[in-house]
């Protein structure tokens, strides 16, 4: 295979991967009272319809993926339990 064709195909494949990356949406709330913190998920596999488990000030919630960065996915290795979080 011609090296120029190979390089072009490789560049196309890499750009497709980068452009198709999905993120958690920006959280709506920027603060939360401690008594209202609830985790609906602890990892992406807790969510349905290929949603992401996203960390927010009031806990972890499942959200549809966004094309724009702004939110933060939950670390699947972090200690987490679903339900209300009591301090």
Curated annotation (Swiss-Prot):
Q: Where is the signal peptide?
A: 1-20
Question: Would I find Secreted among this entry's keywords?
Answer: yes
> Which SUPFAM superfamilies does the UniProt entry name for this protein?
Elafin-like
Q: Which residues form the WAP domain?
A: 21-66
Instruction: Please list the tissues where expression of this protein has been recorded.
Output: Expressed by the venom gland.
Is Thylakoid among the key words of this record? no
**Protein name stated in the entry:** U14-lycotoxin-Ls1a
Its post-translational modification remark reads: Contains 5 disulfide bonds.
Which GO cellular component term is one of those annotated?
Answer: extracellular region
Q: What does this protein do?
A: Has antibacterial activity.
- Give the primary localization class: secreted
The molecular function GO annotations come to: toxin activity
What's in the keyword line of the UniProt record? Antibiotic, Antimicrobial, Disulfide bond, Secreted, Signal, Toxin
Family to which this protein belongs: Belongs to the venom protein 11 family. 01 (wap-1) subfamily.
Localisation: Secreted
